[in-house]
Amino acid sequence: MTKPSNDEPPLTNVRDLEAMLPLEEEDLTADSQDLEYTAVAHRQQFSTDLVRLYLQDIGRIPLLKRDEEVHIAQQVQSYLRLVEIQNRAAESDAAIDQYQTAIAVHDQLLVQLGHRPSYERWAKILGQTVATLKQTLKSGKKRWAELAGLTVEELENIEKQGITAKAHMIKANLRLVVSVAKKYQNRGLELLDLIQEGTLGLERAVEKFDPTKGYRFSTYSYWWIRQGITRAIATQSRMIRLPVHITEKLNKIKRAQRKISQEKGHTPKIDEVAEELGMTPEQVREVLTQVPRSVSLELKVGQDKDTELMDLLETDTQSPEDELMREALQNDMQEILLDLTPREQEVIALRFGFQDGVAHSLSEIGRILNLSRERVRQIEAKALQKLRHPRRRDRIRDYYENLG
């Protein structure tokens, strides 16, 4: 864990600025209509003042030059490789698992309290003595360093540099978040909330950026920022009242329908869609029954009713950012698949089109591998169970929320 710098950093959370602005008192002698108008005006002015202060704050941070960007990204990746070693070991190494549990509790307390917890409070939550907690941290850090082939001092230096570099990269690109967020105003969320969600997307971009690929970070991070913002609009706004998991299933069904239609030249039946997705026909019908049938895609939505519903739904158009993300997804998937057996790798690669870009049905895979459809299903189920482990699942989850 890294000690905070003595320098006061620019605020990355726009809501942190709220305490800096005084609220004006309402005119209690006004009638109810005037009070409502005054309240709305105050909220609008309050939001404008927050954005202005936020822009002034991040405007003091210099943009990164290309060589600085590469150097900082390398420090982040060096640290994240150590984190990956730790995560892999936690599945079977007791010392690492206990260390991770202790750190997770520390981080939760840090968020709740707003400051670092005392060892006494930290140990109490874990049900340990302070001495036991300190030994857990020492043993876990030592084991982590051993697995990484480093001394504890070397590991802590890389950890400190990586955490500092990650924060630096985020702060240096907050202006891009504001720029993207402004494009999605008046769609159900305030600009401040859009900036907040975009910043979370930026953080994901910093974690996944590979400086050896040759493209600029701004190009790469644009997709992640946009992904964070558009997902927040779909999830939190009141324009579309479908749960996120239903929306995701609908998108999968839509893609399957499109694929079958292109391959077979007819409108797919529910049974065909179900087989393609590994679902039962009843499950597909259940999802489809939750779609409002009377809503026009030309329906005007948003605060000013100037956005069509179609604008918020997926399209078949591939942007350069989407193509870049597909390449990144392929790279991440190749690494994740190494955790599977060779036969499981074959089945998953064919099922999701990782080999030739064509996603095959269970029956097709069975013919290719000379296996029964049921055997292919069993292999796929076992492989997917492994891939659902949080360490692997979280690595690719965000891709599938926006990529088809």
From Swiss-Prot:
One of its GO terms (biological process) is DNA-templated transcription initiation. CDD domains: Sigma70_r4. Gene3D superfamilies: RNA Polymerase Primary Sigma Factor, Winged helix-like DNA-binding domain superfamily/Winged helix DNA-binding domain. This is Probable RNA polymerase sigma-C factor. Keywords: DNA-binding, Sigma factor, Transcription, Transcription regulation. Transmembrane segments: none annotated. Belongs to the sigma-70 factor family. A motif (Polymerase core binding) lies at residues 193-206. GO terms for molecular function: DNA binding; sigma factor activity. InterPro entries: RNA_pol_sigma-70_dom, RNA_pol_sigma70, RNA_pol_sigma70_r1_2, RNA_pol_sigma70_r2, RNA_pol_sigma70_r3, RNA_pol_sigma70_r4, RNA_pol_sigma_r2, RNA_pol_sigma_r3/r4-like. Sigma factors are initiation factors that promote the attachment of RNA polymerase to specific initiation sites and are then released. The lineage of its organism: Bacteria, Bacillati, Cyanobacteriota, Cyanophyceae, Synechococcales. The keyword Transcription applies. It comes from Synechocystis sp. (strain ATCC 27184 / PCC 6803 / Kazusa).
